Amino acid sequence: MQIAFSGRLGSGKSTVCAILRDTYGYEIYSTGTVQRKVAEDMGISTLELNERMTKDPTLDHIIDDAVVKLSREKSGSQIVYDSRMAWHFAENTFKVYMYVDPTIAAKRVFNADRGDVEKYASEEDALNQLNARGNEENKRFKKIYNVDNFDYSNYHLIIDSTTPSPEQIADAIAKGAKDFEENPYTDTKMLVSPFVVFPTAPYGTDDEEEIVITLVDSVHYCVKGHNKLAALQLCGSAFAHATFQKNAPITPDKTLFKEYEKAANFKFFTNI
């Protein structure tokens, strides 16, 4: 089963990819890997290819076409495409998007040793730069491809790296890919920290349904399944199993957020 792996900046995709490679035997094809293969096929250096692509953004299609070709040629192989847009081009893949709370992403990249490539004055600076880069990237994708990389409905699985370990995430993705290969589906499943999902119903609401989550302005809200969400917050679970519902009507209420925080003695990661 091939996996198309996208996600937020600072979510830890590279670390998870390494575990999928070392533990589960997946080959990893990053954008850089594909670029090197394309440059080799063209008889030029990757530097020259990058220079050409910088001058002419329409040359992005060279990489896109290479991903399509690769996914066809290696259709029976275990491959992970670590690329923002692979979900749009790689055929017959399990499409995964990795979320992370923005403040946690900023903390990670600020404390990481990335040499002179990325430098940040503070965690706040890292947060602002990551948000700006992510939004700018997505604008570019919308302009070139007319798709929204942040739209959860493009993916089969949304997985959250805010609290779980990279090993837990890799295990969940490998299992998800196997399950999807055996029983394909078209909706969007979610494995997210219960501490990044805000309630829309009072604490103690008699709601025994499965958890359904929607996304509004990059914030997760619980549409259904508040009892289960509250129980997961109470026991400190790493993941809430949920289904994504696009454009669900909700009314954010900060008094509800405080009810849930007080009941389970925690704080939501994001302040809204």
Language model regions located:
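Hydrophobic anchor at the beta1->P-loop junction of P-loop NTPases
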Residues: 5
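P-loop (Walker A) phosphate-binding loop of NTP-binding proteins
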Residues: 8
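ATP-dependent small-molecule kinase phosphotransfer cores
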Residues: 27, 31-90, 103-104, 115-118, ...
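Short alpha-helix boundary/capping and kink motifs at helix termini
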Residues: 178-221, 233
